[in-house]
A protein has these predicted regions:
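Conserved active-site-proximal phosphate/metal-binding subdomains
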Residues: 152-166, 172-312
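Residue-level detector of alpha-helix initiation sites
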Residues: 22, 171-172
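Active-site entrance/lid segments in N-terminal catalytic domains of soluble metabolic enzymes
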Residues: 1-164
Length: 312
């Protein structure tokens, strides 16, 4: 099995999650320079020109591979799909939809296509379309989530397809990275553990909330309505879930979520902002450089795998 770094040309077999409103060109470049595949989150861009600017800034700051994450339900998805070709992006990851209508265009441009899935049946459907790899993301992750855990999902996706599988959700240290390889993954995508990096552009209040978090301090909003999102517990998320269980309609619930991610990221509103974070938030204890986080993640994972091999 080829490791992800051999496929992507990165130092480590690790992808930085393309978090909307967070994963800027500068942040992606920092992650790429530190050995991961940095991703720009197109989902948070207000228009195509903003994405172009971020791609160009990333290119100016790194000579390492990087990519763009595209949310296919975004109203600018068609425009973004063309921009990544025009700007010479090397890797595209996709979520929230089927990338089928764009794959031929991307492949002709030499772009590696890696969709994110939350179920093995989706992976099996996407493989014949010509994807290069698949990210199997468990419900432990922050942001939009499915129902299956990473432990259950990854091996089933590995068994369902013949392309490389990347594990995501619940990975913040070497033990979890080693587990991802044991499940059959060729690498991992991480997001929450990078939110507390020095280079991450989120507000300091957001970082402080992450560092205060304990193991049970996340909650999933929108599960009943079909748009589940994992966030830290706060006034907004608790009230959202309470109203959802009481039968509030979509319009009533939108008053809690409209603009809530931007409030958290840019204004540091930890009461009514959407503090997206995975269940590993309770494992975060300090703000460090991206390079320190990734170096330790890989080295501790390598040591864990070596220790496990001695048991056999």
């Amino acid at each position: 099995m080829k490791l992800l770094n051999e496929i992507l040309g990165t130092k480590y077999p690790i992808i930085q999650g393309g978090m909307a409103n967070i994963a800027t060109g500068e942040f992606a470049a920092a992650c790429s320079n530190a050995g991961a595949l940095g991703l720009i989150g197109a989902g948070g861009m207000r228009d195509g020109d903003t994405l172009r600017e971020n791609i160009r800034r990333c290119k100016a700051l790194t000579d390492q591979p990087f990519g763009v994450n595209i949310m296919l339900m975004h109203p600018l998805a068609d425009e973004v799909a063309k921009i990544v070709v025009e700007e010479g992006v090397q890797v595209v990851t996709t979520g929230a939809g089927n990338p089928g209508k764009y794959i031929q265009m991307w492949k002709e441009a030499g772009i590696k296509v890696i969709p994110v899935v939350a179920a093995a049946v989706l992976a099996k459907h996407l493989e014949p379309l010509g994807v290069d790899a698949i990210i199997a993301e468990g419900t432990e992750s922050g942001g939009h989530v499915g129902e299956m855990t990473t432990m259950a999902l990854v091996p089933q996706v590995v068994d369902a397809v013949n392309v490389p599988v990347i594990a995501a959700g619940g990975i913040a240290d070497g033990r979890q990275l080693a587990a991802a390889f044991a499940l059959g993954a060729c690498g991992a995508q991480v997001g929450t553990c990078l939110l507390v990096s020095e280079e991450c552009p989120i507000h300091e209040n957001y970082k402080a909330a992450l560092l205060r978090a304990k193991d049970s301090d996340t909650i999933v909003t929108g599960r009943i309505g079909g748009t589940p999102v994992r966030v830290l517990k706060n006034r907004m998320s608790r009230e959202y879930v309470r109203q959802e269980k009481a039968g509030a309609d979509k319009m009533e619930l939108e008053k809690y979520t409209l603009g809530s991610l931007r409030r958290a990221v840019f204004e540091g509103d930890t009461a009514t902002g959407s503090l997206m974070a995975g269940q590993v938030a309770g494992m975060l204890h300090e703000v460090r450089p991206v390079a320190a986080i990734l170096d330790e993640l890989w080295e501790s994972g390598r040591q864990r795998m070596a220790a496990l091999s001695e048991l056999c």
